[in-house]
Amino acid sequence: MMENNRNFFITIALSVAILTLWQVFYMNPRIEAERETTRIAAEHAQPAQPGQSAQPPAAGSADLPGGATPAMPAEGVPGSGVPGSGVPGAGVPGVLSRQDAIASSGRVRIETPRLAGSINLTGARIDDLVLRDYRATVEPNSPNIELLSPSSLPDGYYAEIGFIGTAAAGALPGPDTVWTAAGDTALTPSTPVTLTFTNESGLTFTRTIAVDNDYLFTISDAIANESGEAVSLSSYGRVARIGTPHVAGFYILHEGLIGVTGEEGLQEIDYSDLAEKREIKPGKSNDGWLGITDKYWAVALVPSGAEAFQPRYAYFDDGRVRYQADFLADPVELAAGETRNVETLVFAGAKETAKIDAYEESRGIRNFDLLIDWGWFYFITKPMFYVIDWLFRLLGNFGLAILATTVLVKAVFFPLANKSYKSMANMKKVQPQLMEIREKYGDDRMKQQQAMMELYKTEKINPLAGCWPVLIQIPVFFALYKVLYVTIEMRHAPFFGWIRDLSAPDPTSVFNLFGLLPYDVPTFLMIGIWPLIMGVTMFLQMRMNPTPPDPTQAMIFNWMPVVFTFMLAAFPAGLVIYWAWNNTLSIIQQGVIMKRQGAKIELWDNLVGLFRKKPKPAE
């Protein structure tokens, strides 16, 4: 039994050591890089003004789906110039400011309770979008998040819907098409806008763009064929991004191109993988969606599904790096005098769970909830989010909701934990008998193990029962970590005091006396108040049990709280608060059960023993 315990503790020690090294040399540098990116974004962003776009999206040039131009199909993928190439400086990153890029073309304003921006009449692109409800940092005067930008900027990012057809169809709506808006109207939830375009062949396109109160645009195209002959055309849509954005690069979070289409289902493609493969084409599909996702924001297209479509994820590097998620619908025949309607949905905004789920249900969008990276433990993570969110609405604070969730989890697992703690209490009762067995059999480990197992069987004790309280926490711990890390609802959610963002690490550090000393400390020394509280509660919980007699086990026993304090210091504050509160509840629960079982609580004796002089070994 002693040998098993030794191996168990050594395994834990090695695991903790690996996690610590991973945290120091892998996670901490990435967290530091993410903080630096946020700081730079905050410095360069401009606050959004009501009714005015704070950041115009880029109308960038990107190759069209299916390797075709708007006028006709083509075998190769032509490199098209930046739409509106008559604008001085267009296509030359850094020449135009954001304001100049927006002002260089005609636009229709977007004014909703949650969005500000504009639609570029060249290409009818949604390329200027600002999120009114979200800011770059926790500071109330920090800039709003600028989601989309014109393509003439280094960080161009936009969504575009157009058509491709045969030469007989003439010039079809594409990147360079200049649409005509009906009057000087703004796009609001109550006032859709109508754009028109008529080509030389007699095809008239009437586009109606509507937006809801949140993040969903509905683009409805009515195509009237007045050319006198039948034509064939296909609708396409694309989300294009210029430049490679900074990503966290953390394995529990996907940032890059994403979609759910065809038999393949969910496709998650990293920027680096797409740059290597250049193009990824899943099978054709009649439903689904595709786009580009960040940690908290996303832009996605939902084809109508009336015709099958070919999804594609592509990378271009012809002077400027571009990533593109696009689709090309099967061609349809439009008889002379016929009018056909095509509808495409565009999601552009924050990945709010309730909104994403509502769109999936009301619009019938297949697996749209996978736009949020719930991970492999989806069946635990998403329900846990909804529990926390429900408690938040009840209590008004996500920190309190996490504490209440911990109590609920404790209640759910109480029967198992209760049985475990009872077994641990019984183990304490038989300690004298175990000592007798060790003395009786000395170095004969085989007989010692047999005698111990017989004693456990007689007393109905499970020697590994003490592991259950820790093991049952592991899936809950990782599910909560996922919720805190990937859900936007936790972003900038405050607790009390100095914790202004539960999704970020505790900003204080003991090494500068929690901010009293005027200098910053390295990331790996950011040991804040809550990590210290967590470490103390873990230390007290471990001291509830006798110190292992084996020196190796005793050393691990003593150092484990210290190691975990350093390791969890860089984790989200909400997770550390959960762990500290969970330890506190476990101490109370274990103490009550042990007292009822008549087992001695070793906490006080172990604490006193830390300050007691150890006897010198006999000469």
Can you annotate each of these PLM segments?
Residues A479-G535:
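Conserved catalytic motifs of ABC-family nucleotide-binding domains
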Residues D369-K440, M446-K447, M453-K457, F477, ...:
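Transmembrane alpha-helical segments that form the functional core of multipass membrane systems
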Residues F9-Q23, F477-L480, L532-V536, V562-V563:
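Core hydrophobic alpha-helical membrane-spanning segments
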Residues M1-A411, L603-E619:
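Membrane-protein biogenesis/insertion across secretory and organellar systems
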Residues L395-F398, F566-V576:
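Transmembrane helix interruption/hinge and helix-loop junction motifs
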Residues A404-V409, Q473, M526-F539:
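Hydrophobic alpha-helical transmembrane segments
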Residues L203, D221, G337, V412-F477, ...:
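Membrane-interface amphipathic helices and adjacent TM-edge segments
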Residues P531, G574-N583:
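Hydrophobic core segments of alpha-helical transmembrane domains in multi-pass membrane proteins
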